């Protein structure tokens, strides 16, 4: 019989559910949030692969969990977006470095951090409008994440590279981001939800207009971390593993300095 069988009376292995998180962070945006650190083209086999090199800042921790695609809490490990940003090869992103840095700075040992990956590579901000698949999935996953009593502490948002090629998209970015934040806060009933967005480091065309909108957004409880100058891979678009670690630490510092 395929798949084997369980003898009558034989105990099924017990699955230990982790203690649910009490501090929850949403990770959203496009590919640099999903993580492409360490992803390279294997020309021999003509496919993209992750090198599986894991910096110590990104090491797993039993007190850092992630919400899987099927809405279960499990111990977090890279790639955080493996079952979320599907159809692509994910590698190291900023999430684990961020979570470890925050965990190390918190004064209580009882803190359990929950990461909710929602990013999707190659997406423009108009694809995150209320009613879209990506927006509604993010809201659903966020709502699910707090059913066990955890508190949504912040949204980390890294997106914009797909909005630099068209002048209209670039000039509309600020208004679109403003609307996204207001919609998300309203739909989650969290009017003061902290948002930490990343000013993009790469992309051609009208990148300066998108960055200007990101750095100049004037909303309460919104801060911006600038990724400009962080090391890029040979594609001049995605952050290296080292850069993702640096970004994660910068995001943690922004959170701890502004919202703790």
UniProtKB/Swiss-Prot annotation:
Which cellular component terms (GO) are annotated to the entry?
cytosol
Q: What keywords tag this UniProt record?
A: Hydrolase
The record's section on Gene3D superfamilies has: SGNH hydrolase (3.40.50.1110)
Which residue positions are annotated as catalytic?
31, 235, 238
Q: Which GO terms describe its molecular function?
A: hydrolase activity
Q: Name one Pfam family in it.
A: SASA
In terms of superkingdom, the source organism counts as Eukaryota
Q: What is its EC number?
A: 3.1.-.-
Q: What ranges does the record give for the region Disordered, renumbered to this chain?
A: 1-22
Q: Which InterPro entries match?
A: Carb_Esterase_6 (IPR052940), SASA (IPR005181), SGNH_hydro_sf (IPR036514)
Give a yes or no for keyword Calcium in this entry: no
Question: Is the keyword DNA-binding in the record?
Answer: no
Q: Which family does it belong to?
A: Belongs to the carbohydrate esterase 6 family.
- What is this protein called in UniProt? Probable carbohydrate esterase At4g34215
């Amino acid at each position: 019989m395929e798949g084997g069988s369980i003898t009558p009376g034989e105990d099924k292995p017990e699955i230990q559910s982790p203690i649910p998180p009490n501090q929850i962070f949403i990770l959203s945006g496009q590919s640099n949030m999903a993580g492409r650190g360490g992803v390279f083209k294997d020309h021999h086999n003509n496919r993209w692969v992750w090198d599986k090199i894991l910096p110590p800042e990104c090491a797993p921790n039993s007190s850092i969990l992630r919400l899987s695609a099927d809405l279960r809490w499990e111990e977090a490990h890279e790639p955080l977006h493996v079952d979320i940003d599907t159809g692509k090869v994910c590698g190291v992103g900023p999430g684990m470095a961020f979570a470890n840095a925050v965990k190390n700075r918190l004064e209580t040992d009882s803190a359990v951090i929950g990461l909710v990956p929602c990013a999707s590579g190659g997406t423009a901000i108009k694809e995150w409008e209320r009613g879209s698949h990506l927006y509604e999935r993010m809201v659903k996953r966020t709502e699910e994440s707090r059913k066990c009593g955890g508190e949504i502490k912040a949204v980390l948002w890294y997106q914009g590279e797909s909005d630099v090629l068209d002048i209209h998209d670039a000039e509309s970015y600020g208004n679109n981001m403003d609307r996204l934040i207001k919609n998300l806060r309203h739909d989650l009933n969290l009017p003061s939800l902290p948002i930490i967005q990343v000013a993009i480091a790469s992309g051609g065309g009208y990148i300066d207009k998108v960055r200007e909108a990101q750095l100049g957004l004037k909303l309460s409880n919104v801060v911006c971390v600038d990724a400009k100058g962080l090391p890029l891979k040979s594609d001049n678009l995605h952050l290296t593993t080292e850069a993702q670690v640096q970004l994660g630490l910068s995001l943690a510092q922004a959170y701890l300095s502004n919202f703790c």
